[in-house]
């Protein structure tokens, strides 16, 4: 099984690679359909997670995913996307929404991080003491495009 992570930020894709993701694609430079075809060949892909929250993203997924597959919408959309419901039905696509995680999800994540299967260190951009919370938020404001997670130690 292969996983393709997409983004419009080369910085974020580099962080994904440091976390162990092998296949990444900057969809601002290469269309999803072209990148997915290169990776998956004629089989396309059978599952997708929409986490961007923009109409063009979910439309691209619908156009590229294999017939009868599932798209899980994790993102919170800023405005209601317009989707081609005829295409959705004709291609037997399933669109599932999700808002919260279940207790079992946390247990699985803890096991995967503890075993080393998932590397989180590359996601951490900086550390601050609790007393430095103003400085931490200033850092976030000034470095939003090149930072991921900021740790504030209690």
Spans of features found by a protein language model:
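Residues in the short beta-alpha loop(s) of Rossmann-like NAD(P)-binding domains
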Residues: 8-9, 77, 101
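C-terminal hydrophobic helical "lid"/dimerization subdomain
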Residues: 10, 59-63, 103-154
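Rossmann-fold NAD(P)-binding glycine/threonine-rich loop
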Residues: 75-93, 104-111
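Adenosine-nucleotide cofactor-binding segment
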Residues: 1-60
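Short glycine-centered segments of the SAM/dcSAM-binding site in methyltransferase folds
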Residues: 69-70, 94
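Conserved catalytic-site loops of classical short-chain dehydrogenases/reductases
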Residues: 47, 70-72
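Helix-to-beta-strand junctions that scaffold the AdoMet/dcAdoMet cofactor pocket
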Residues: 65-67
